[in-house]
Amino acid sequence: DPAYFADRQAAGDTLWCYSCCFPDDAYHLNKFIDQPARYARLIKWACYTSGITGFLHWGFNFWDIPTYGTAPDAHYKGDGFIVYPDTENSAVRMSARGMATTEGIEDYELLKIAEGIDPIASHALANTVARTFSDFSADPEAISHARQTLLALCEMGKREQ
């Protein structure tokens, strides 16, 4: 219920979210292997436009659980992990979805910086990319353009200081 969350935010509460298994379709942002990696990035843009200040990444390393794995019959492909084991080197390897998640976090922080410079422009820009978790642009060029515009806005604010 969006009104409930808006009321809580108006009362001064912070709003966090996370993705875990659902929704598992192509019309909602998530981080499944079957979705474009940019969806994982856009989650953070939708967090920004929704006033969400925290994101819990569920399942960093559940690659050994078949339900969340990469097998064709896995129900939630990739939801349980964004890294892969590198047992030979006792390390982990980042996935494309993990890198996209990192880029999304960086974008979120840049949006917050831009908000301090020009809140109207920052929110308008974010809305060109992800208005909600189910209303977003899947166009890579639009996302790239928004990122470049965001960087320019932050740079403009830096020069004015």
Residue ranges of model-derived segments:
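Catalytic-core regions of glycoside hydrolase
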Residues: 1-66
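Catalytic domains of carbohydrate-active enzymes that cleave complex glycans
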Residues: 52, 67-161
